[in-house]
């Protein structure tokens, strides 16, 4: 089972991007599950999501505690301790940022880090700060799913 955790902010399309991944994997014959986690907060508040992909029925229904893939839609969330909590060794980490990897002050965990200026791409193409589509492209490339 592949487990993916999303960290973003309300309005960035975190939930929609996870729904698109689940729909895509289900249509390809796999099983997918997405559990969003957010409150009644307004746009800009932290949003989390937990996604699973497997070849068989997914019976577990809880948060993803040990992700193999981490999608971070806002680099200001890198400072939150729970962002990297439980990260599997050699996990894939995709970060929406304009900074290079050395500037991010990432924890000393063995991981494969990919950065993309998804916000810049979104602003250039749709003139809105909704980076989910560019993040989906980075996800597809980095994970080869």
Language-model segments: which ranges?
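Active-site cofactor/cluster-binding pocket
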Residues: 1-145
């Amino acid at each position: 089972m592949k487990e993916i955790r999303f960290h973003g902010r309300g309005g960035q399309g975190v939930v929609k991007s996870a729904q698109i991944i689940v729909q895509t994997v289900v249509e390809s014959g796999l099983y997918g599950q997405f559990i969003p986690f957010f409150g009644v907060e307004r746009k800009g508040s932290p949003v989390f999501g937990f996604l699973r992909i497997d070849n068989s029925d997914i019976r577990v229904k809880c948060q993803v505690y040990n992700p193999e893939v981490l999608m971070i839609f806002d680099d200001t969330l890198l400072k939150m301790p729970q962002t990297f909590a439980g990260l599997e060794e050699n996990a894939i980490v995709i970060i929406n940022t304009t900074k290079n990897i050395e500037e991010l002050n990432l924890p000393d965990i063995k991981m494969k880090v990919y950065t993309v200026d998804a916000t810049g791409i979104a602003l250039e193409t749709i003139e809105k700060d909704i980076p989910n589509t560019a993040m989906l492209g980075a996800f597809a490339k980095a994970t080869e799913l």
